[in-house]
Amino acid sequence: CIDTGMKREKARAEQAFELAEQGKTVCVISSGDAGIYGMAPLVYEMKRERGSRVEIEVLPGISAFQKAASLLGAPIGHDFCVISLSDLMTPWDRIEKRIHAAATADFVTAVYNPKSEGRHCHRYSYKQI
């Protein structure tokens, strides 16, 4: 069992990937959406960077934004986008460009990670845009 907690996702994925490359059967379990701001993109990126032949299978559940929209009675249809305000793995200036692009294109936007203990201003910046 590899338990790294928050902010150590890359280290956990690297450890799991190394075990898989040694021929072990590995299962990475994490909360959240597997392919949307989850662990799957990290693992696929490692596979690509290493030129690995490790077989990957992702078993996603329903996305949080879909469930939230359903509970609110506001299903998301047609074109839309999903933006995370977390700058742990993506620089804020890149996130801000994406917010501007989504607003310019008039997309319905689902927002992930609107606040955290150490980051309060991004939510307000998003609202201003």
Task: Show which residues each predicted segment covers.
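Non-catalytic terminal and connector segments of soluble metabolic enzymes
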Residues: K10, E14, L19, I99-A105, ...
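Class I S-adenosyl-L-methionine
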Residues: C1-I56, K67
